[in-house]
Amino acid sequence: MGDTTLMTADELLRLDLPDKRTELIRGRLVVRDPGGARHGAVAMTLGYRIMAHVEAHDLGRVYAAETGFKIESDPDTVRAPDVAFIAQDRVPEVEPRGYPGWAPDLAVEVLAHDDHPAETLEKVAQWLKAGVRLVWVVDSERRTARVYRADGSEALLDANATLDGEDVLPGFRCPLVDLW
């Protein structure tokens, strides 16, 4: 019989696993190796573009890679997108010390070398269920992005397409070719 002890978000926050990416899925710890160079470069480039746009237009707050968001409780789920954005009207007056108990408006996932399609789809479903309005899954190997919206619609963007912030990140546009 396997160990069925579930971890809480508070326990995850205190966990010390340097050089690892951690998330909590329904109380179960998931530990992964860091993303590679391409993953990091694409996530940073897109995060920088989003941050510059958000600051220029005072749209809200951008969170860096591996910021955990507690999106389910009992058992806890803590997910950490590569980039996250929350709109200005949702920015808390006092930033939580631990994991925020709310979902961002935009979650960006840049696929890493060890990401599996079924796990990525599960993560997208969890983000949308938690209230994320727009999810971008960027695949640097295939040079594509998939856009998932809260209304259930989705789109596959090829290498020549442009990411659009729609009503979530108004005015933001980033050609995918700029990410590679």
Language-model features, listed with the residues they occupy:
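Gly/Pro/Ser/Thr-rich low-complexity, intrinsically disordered segments predominantly at protein N-termini
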Residues: 1-180
